[in-house]
Amino acid sequence: MKFAFALAALSTALLAAGPARAQPALAEIKVSYQPALYWALPFYVATEKGWWAEVGLKPEFSTFPAGVPQIAASASKSWDVGGTGSVPAVLGHVRFGIKTIGLTNDESAGNALLVRKDVADKFTKDPASMKGQTILLTANSTGDYAVQSCLKKYGLTKADVTIKNMGQAEIISAVSSNNADLAGLWAPNIYTLEEKAGAKVLCSGKEGSAMVPGALIARGEYAESNPENVAKFLAVYLRAWSWLNANKPQAIEMMTKFYAQGGVSISPASMMKEFTTRPTYTLAQQLTAMDRTRGTSNMDGWFADIATFMRGTGAIQSIPASADYVTDAYMKRVQADPKLREFANRSN
């Protein structure tokens, strides 16, 4: 009897374990980003909501202070997919074969040239007086691109000023301590300097007529070998934006927590400004931006302008064809899969 009871118990346990064993294992995917940035918020939201597992992914995150070290880390395969600025995305293609697979946001207004409050009136009234001055910025970044577009707006060139390459935290410290007058920053660092030191935005990338897109990226080798995982990654990212844009009060709450993790504290008003000044893209809008049915796409043009700027700075030697690295193949996979498409567009 004892044997029979034990056998029955074992059979029951095996039956109970059967369905659990049948569940497919989650696919690990290494996701890279820069902390406490607007376009990286979807990664945090998706994790808090448990959406990665819903599509069969298990993310492993790595963060970087800026795009250049992030791109360099791809050489050791320390990440598979992620988000970055458009300038490092182009650099990543040239140096490491990285693919641009989508857009994080339009951050044209989120990259700017700022001026210290004590000299704000001087440079606002006479921007040309920046000639001969020193501008602190992070080289080969979207902030660099925005600053140079602003200089062009005012009839100046990079040769007319002294550029000093520094990290964003160092720039904030220098301006706050009155050791610098002019600086190139991206949001939310812009808001930090405005709120903590009273700095003023002299000119944004948008005001300098520069389109500054943020990029979703993937290592070329990984994307080629794991196209389904890349499509799932995109679907998760898009769903997070769908939810964020439909639930602003909760979005601000989550942004507050996410920014705090990266040591950033800005006012709710500045957080809302992130949403109102930096458009994001639905699945349909992503596909429209990448559409080449009539020739070059909008994204092709934006990234060609970025590459032209980079050749001018000496970061790259020639301008690569956008079609060599900007690809809609993975967004199209999301669109073609009914489940992923519905998931990406879900706002709850």
Q: Language-model segments: which ranges?
A:
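Pocket-lining segment of extracytoplasmic ligand-binding domains
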Residues: V119, E170-P268
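Solvent-exposed, polar/charged alpha-helical surfaces in well-ordered, non-transmembrane soluble domains
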Residues: K49-G50, A72, S76, V90, ...
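Secondary-structure end/capping motifs
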Residues: S225-Q317
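Conserved C-terminal helix/tail region of periplasmic/extracytoplasmic solute-binding proteins
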Residues: W302-N348
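Bacterial N-terminal signal peptides
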Residues: A4-A16
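Short, glycine-/small- and polar/acidic-enriched structural segments
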Residues: Q23-G167, D181-A187, C203-S204, A210
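Sec/Tat signal peptide C-region and signal peptidase I cleavage site
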Residues: G18-A22
